[in-house]
């Protein structure tokens, strides 16, 4: 089982010491995973979308932890929450956000390596990520749900992901 105990990831009830791979790059080979393992890394923070399904199998096999990230990145739309600003705060986009978050969850939920889910990457916070958080928490009872750009707002579980943080 995976949980969150006072901001620290817990695996089967025991705190997990985490060290995140600093730069994932665009592709990951089995030899890269083994090299990262030798260097003491055990956590991969995936980018938004476009990750090969074999990566999850490799991480399962080699004992890496993974934070799965939904394929949402609205960084090109700016960070404005005003009307006409970022789509994250536009209710017209809510169904699309929920669909992407849910698809990301259902695609990866059975991989033991997936220890947390991230709502989006580089997007303004707003109603669609609030609703996405609530929706995902309704589906996932144990693993943390994160949004690194939440800025201390309630739609991200508090979790330290690396000793360097």
Regions found by a protein language model. Name each.
Residues 1-38, 57:
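N-terminal carbohydrate-binding accessory modules
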Residues 29-31, 43-165:
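Substrate-binding/catalytic cleft of secreted carbohydrate-active enzymes
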């Amino acid at each position: 089982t995976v949980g969150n105990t006072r901001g620290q990831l817990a695996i089967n009830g025991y705190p997990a010491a985490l060290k995140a791979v600093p730069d994932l790059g665009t592709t990951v080979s089995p030899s890269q995973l083994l090299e990262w393992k030798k260097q003491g890394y055990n956590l991969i923070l995936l980018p938004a979308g476009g990750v090969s399904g074999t990566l999850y199998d490799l991480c399962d096999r080699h004992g890496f932890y993974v934070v799965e990230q939904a394929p949402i990145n609205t960084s090109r739309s700016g960070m404005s929450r005003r009307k006409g600003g970022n789509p994250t705060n536009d209710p017209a986009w809510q169904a699309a956000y929920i669909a992407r978050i849910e698809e990301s969850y259902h695609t990866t939920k059975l991989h033991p390596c997936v220890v947390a889910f991230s709502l989006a990457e580089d997007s303004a916070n707003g109603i669609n990520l609030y609703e996405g958080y609530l929706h995902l928490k309704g589906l996932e009872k144990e693993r943390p749900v994160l949004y690194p750009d939440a800025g201390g707002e309630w739609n991200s579980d508090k979790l330290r992901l690396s000793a360097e943080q």
